[in-house]
From Swiss-Prot:
Listed name of the protein: Succinyl-diaminopimelate desuccinylase
GO biological process: diaminopimelate biosynthetic process; L-arginine biosynthetic process; lysine biosynthetic process via diaminopimelate
Chain positions recorded as Zn(2+) 2 binding sites: D106, E142, H359
Domain of life: Bacteria
Family note: Belongs to the peptidase M20A family. DapE subfamily.
Binding annotation for Zn(2+) 1: H73, D106, E170
Free-text comment on the cofactor: Binds 2 Zn(2+) or Co(2+) ions per subunit.
Membrane-traversing stretches: none
Cross-referenced PROSITE patterns: ARGE_DAPE_CPG2_2 (PS00759)
Any GO molecular function: cobalt ion binding
Coiled coil: none
Annotated active site: D75, E141 (proton acceptor)
PANTHER family to which the protein is assigned, alphabetical: ACETYLORNITHINE DEACETYLASE, N-ACETYL-L-CITRULLINE DEACETYLASE
Length: 387
């Protein structure tokens, strides 16, 4: 295989053990290939108290507009027990038409396709193609996401960098390549409810105040009615309780407090502030004067957002349809991604590989999908800079 093929590039990246926060050689590999292709490359390191230092990569070729950004992350989640894998998690084994390894789909495979498409595009057009291409790559997406894309964007802005559009290579397709583009993401808000009672002996309930019935009352109030009915591009917002805790191993003691944690994935009807106010209103109405509670809402850096379907969305969808024969759905489903940060810099959409095995043992990608995704990204580049 050519060392410029997406398979060769993905194989090399997978062999870099870049579990967050380790760089593992992945950014060094990208920097070398991009530098050889004529990009200016920088690798800023960002820090914050209580979090590990993270190395990032910013590369650009061209000085004119428009500027198309390819974005992604080289960090991966831990592989778990290596013995559970059919092939080593960082071996990059190629078997029966599949490339195995942690990050194969999330998202070293996607980065390899972006790089392969860009190198091929530059081979055809040279450095004077009527615009600029940038790579915005972090090593802190699977971790706290504190010293990664959000700070890399601030760093780039301070240097006068401006972007027109961004394509983020997250694995957006549920089952087969070409199914789905992400044009937005739901927001995420986490909260903790604590109901305050008074500890006592179960044989003397009149001397105690059991917080558990009150907590159940409040929890029921939050899920009794839907938060909304969905919007044009989003499903209805969804609140799920993730834990209810009393921390009481004794069977003859009424506990002093009871706690519950919930998470809401919310649509563009809400901001974190308006949603928090609605949750508090429902809790206060249910509590009345009978239940003493406190509500702690964790600060959210995950707002709901939407990139309005426009000419850029159509351009990417057309490239996908030309290569796969299907028109992708425009979706806002799934979890959060670094698109939530990029949206403040420029319009961003996401399209990458099939995510069925991401974060799993034996994560793998079809070699044919690497070739097809590279062809799609190549079509995007051709159409973007010709238009």
């Amino acid at each position: 295989m050519s060392d410029q093929s997406p398979l060769a590039l993905a194989h090399a990246l997978i062999r870099c053990p870049s579990v967050t926060p380790e760089e593992g050689g992945a950014l060094s590999f990208l920097a070398e290939r991009l530098t050889e292709a004529g990009f200016s490359v920088e690798r800023p390191v960002f820090s914050e108290a209580g979090t590990p230092d993270i190395e990032n990569l910013y590369a650009r070729i061209g000085t004119a507009g428009p500027v198309l950004v390819f974005a992604g992350h080289t960090d991966v989640v831990p592989p778990g027990e290596a013995a559970s894998w059919t092939h080593g998690p960082f071996s990059g084994e190629i078997t029966d038409g599949f490339l195995y390894g942690r990050g194969a789909v999330d998202m070293k495979g996607g980065i390899a396709c972006m790089l392969a498409a860009t190198l091929s595009f530059l081979d055809r057009h040279g450095p004077d193609f009527g615009g600029s291409i940038a790579f915005l790559i972090t090593g802190d997406e699977e971790g706290p996401a504190v010293n990664g894309t959000v700070k890399l964007l601030d760093w780039a802005k301070a240097r006068g960098e401006r972007f027109d559009h961004c394509l983020l290579g997250e694995p957006t397709n549920p089952d087969s390549l070409g199914e789905m583009i992400k044009i937005g993401r739901r927001g995420s808000l986490t909260g903790r409810i604590t109901v305050h009672g008074r500890q006592g002996h179960v044989a003397y309930p009149h001397r105690a105040e059991n917080p558990i019935p009150g907590l159940l009352r409040l929890a029921s109030a939050l899920i009794a009615e839907p938060l909304d009915g969905g919007t044009a591009h989003f499903d209805a917002s969804n609140l799920e309780f993730t834990t209810i805790d009393v921390g009481n191993p004794a069977t003859n003691v009424i506990p002093a407090s009871a706690k519950a944690v919930f998470n809401v994935r919310f649509n563009d009807d809400w901001t974190a502030e308006t949603l928090g106010a609605e949750i508090r209103k429902r809790l206060e109405a249910a509590a009345g004067n009978a239940v003493r509670f406190s509500l702690d809402l964790q600060p959210s850096n995950s707002p709901a957002f939407l990139t309005q379907p426009d000419a850029f969305v159509d351009l990417v969808a057309d490239a996908i349809a030309a290569e796969t024969g299907r028109r992708p759905a425009l979706s806002t489903t799934g979890g959060t991604s670094d698109a939530r940060f990029i949206k403040d810099a420029c319009p961003v959409i996401e399209f990458g590989l099939v995510g069925r095995t991401m974060h799993e043992t034996d994560e793998r990608v079809a070699v044919a999908d690497l070739d097809r995704l590279t062809a799609i990204y190549g079509r995007v580049l051709e159409r973007y800079f010709s238009s």
